């Protein structure tokens, strides 16, 4: 092999001509204290609030306290390898998450990293997790219903698209069940759902995800998970990440449902971070801005004006109460922020009334305007009647000498309570809800034993689906009960009741 000197010198000359000194200027700081997931960093004088900072090993942190001589930074991951004296770099990026269609059907953590083993999220679109909510002029009134598929909710506490409806109750009273049923019921409704699990056990979240898969609901759902074992900063940012993902679809003119399950754990995580950052504690040791924490999150739910797309984002925040105490700090905060609340009671739950909704305390402040006409026709007085029944039932325990009208009201109320019971993962279409409630409010169940009401409903709806499908179809198309259709429905109910009474030997 012959080496020619002129070739070698030519190559060296080319390399020298191409040589370029590249100097990268990076703003760096130094870790002066680390512990409990919080780092104090000296330097970084131009750092922004909520900016992501890079620690050794690629671990990211988020700047939350900008003080005179140092920065309080929470670590978004493991901090065990970080030590005093380590160099910290600015990234120049505010905390952001990936957004867009690529996330639908996926399970991700609060920074958008996949947790489902299906490969990376293929999207080039990102959004900051924090964003100022749309102003009044960009919003329009809530006027379209969001059907939950749950009779008790759709009839008495209707939810509209763009509303914030709080679900509140003690542990193990069915809060998540209502939220998951609502997500399942959005199948085919052109509504994208985001389920944000905050501080829950991994087994609980896995069960929810499995159920969503079984019901075919993951095709329109994104699941954001910050588990009980994750660092507090991830629990703190998880709801904001879910809101950012939802806003992307809302601003594209689509309807979105976001479930925050639950915000009590986010508030506890924020309290932990605030105390570690040496912020002054207030009531129940929460920081003074914990109200703002939830208000700036929930205000992002909106029904946008048609001029800017007309999309909507509905929020269903969940709050866990202790021993039914709805007057505690976080529950009262969120009640005052939201447009209504669904309150669940353990006593009703253990008595077999499921969903265990306390009709007297639950309310929807704006959803009534969005309720379908058909439902309003049959359920207009239902909420008031049930509240009166509860009072009468409590009074009737102390004496049996009741007049006929009171006994009739108790009989009707008892059967309506039975009628409104509904199994989990069994959402019901609007037309079937309307026909079912019609049988109760028109008195067709009064002469039946209370323990036969559920059987009557199941068999009646099966009969209507097979023998009289045109009645339900008319309600579905017109969204109301026309006089002609009501006469058909009345005849069908009377005909079926006669068959049911004969079949079960109740005559």
Curated annotation (Swiss-Prot):
Keyword Protease applies: no
Catalytic activity: ATP + H2O + 4 H(+)(in) = ADP + phosphate + 5 H(+)(out)
Task of the protein: Produces ATP from ADP in the presence of a proton gradient across the membrane. The alpha chain is a regulatory subunit.
Originating gene: atpA
Molecular function GO terms recorded: ADP binding; ATP binding; proton-transporting ATP synthase activity, rotational mechanism
Organism the protein comes from: Desulforudis audaxviator (strain MP104C)
UniProt membrane topology term: Peripheral membrane protein
Protein name from the UniProt record: ATP synthase subunit alpha
One Gene Ontology cellular component annotation held by this UniProt entry: proton-transporting ATP synthase complex
Residues engaged in binding ATP: 169-176
Subunit annotation: F-type ATPases have 2 components, CF(1) - the catalytic core - and CF(0) - the membrane proton channel. CF(1) has five subunits: alpha(3), beta(3), gamma(1), delta(1), epsilon(1). CF(0) has three main subunits: a(1), b(2) and c(9-12). The alpha and beta chains form an alternating ring which encloses part of the gamma chain. CF(1) is attached to CF(0) by a central stalk formed by the gamma and epsilon chains, while a peripheral stalk is formed by the delta and b chains.
């Amino acid at each position: 092999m012959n080496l020619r000197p002129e070739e070698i010198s030519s190559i060296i000359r080319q390399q020298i001509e191409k040589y370029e000194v590249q100097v990268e200027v990076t703003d760096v700081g130094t870790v002066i204290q680390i512990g409990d997931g919080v780092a104090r960093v000296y330097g970084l004088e131009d750092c922004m609030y909520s900016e992501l900072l890079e620690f050794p090993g690629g671990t990211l942190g988020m700047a939350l306290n900008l003080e005179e001589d140092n920065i309080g930074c929470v670590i978004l991951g493991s901090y065990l390898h970080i030590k005093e004296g380590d160099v910290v770099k600015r990234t120049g990026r505010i905390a952001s998450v990936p957004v867009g269609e690529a996330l639908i059907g996926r399970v991700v953590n609060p920074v958008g990293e996949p947790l489902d083993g299906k490969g990376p999220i293929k999207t080039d679109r990102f959004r900051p997790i924090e964003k100022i909510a749309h102003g009044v002029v960009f919003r329009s009134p809530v006027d379209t219903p969001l059907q939950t598929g749950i009779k008790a909710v759709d009839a008495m506490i209707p939810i509209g698209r763009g509303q914030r409806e709080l679900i509140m109750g003690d542990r193990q009273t069915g809060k998540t069940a209502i939220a998951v049923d609502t997500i399942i019921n959005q199948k085919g409704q052109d509504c994208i759902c985001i389920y944000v699990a905050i501080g829950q056990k991994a087994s609980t979240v896995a069960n929810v995800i499995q159920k969503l898969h079984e019901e075919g609901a993951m095709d329109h759902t994104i699941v954001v998970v910050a588990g009980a074992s994750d660092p507090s900063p991830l629990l703190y940012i998880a709801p904001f990440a879910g809101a950012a993902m939802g806003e992307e679809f809302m601003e594209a003119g689509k309807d979105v449902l976001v479930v925050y399950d639950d915000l009590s754990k986010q508030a506890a995580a924020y309290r932990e971070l605030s105390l570690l950052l040496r912020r002054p504690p207030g009531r129940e040791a929460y920081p003074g801005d914990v109200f703002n924490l939830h208000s700036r999150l929930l205000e992002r739910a909106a029904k946008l004006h048609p001029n800017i797309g007309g999309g909507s984002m509905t929020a269903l925040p969940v709050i866990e109460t202790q021993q039914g105490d709805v007057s505690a700090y976080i529950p009262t905060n969120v009640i005052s922020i939201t447009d209504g609340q669904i309150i669940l009671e353990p006593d009703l739950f253990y008595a077999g009334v499921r969903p265990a909704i306390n009709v007297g305390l639950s309310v929807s402040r704006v959803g009534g305007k969005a309720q379908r006409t058909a439902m309003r026709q049959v359920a207009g007085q239902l909420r008031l009647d049930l509240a009166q029944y509860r009072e009468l039932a409590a009074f009737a325990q102390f004496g049996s000498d009741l007049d006929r009208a009171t006994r009739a009201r108790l009989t009707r109320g008892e059967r309506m309570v039975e009628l409104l019971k509904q199994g989990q993962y069994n959402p019901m279409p609007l037309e079937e809800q309307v026909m079912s409630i019609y049988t109760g409010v028109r008195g067709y169940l009064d002469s039946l034993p209370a323990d036969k009401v559920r059987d009557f409903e199941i068999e009646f709806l099966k009969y209507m689906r097979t023998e009289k499908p045109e009645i339900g179809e008319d309600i579905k198309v017109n969204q109301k009960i026309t006089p002609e259709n009501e006469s058909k429905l009345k005849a069908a109910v009377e005909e079926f009741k006669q068959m049911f009474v004969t079949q079960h030997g109740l005559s």
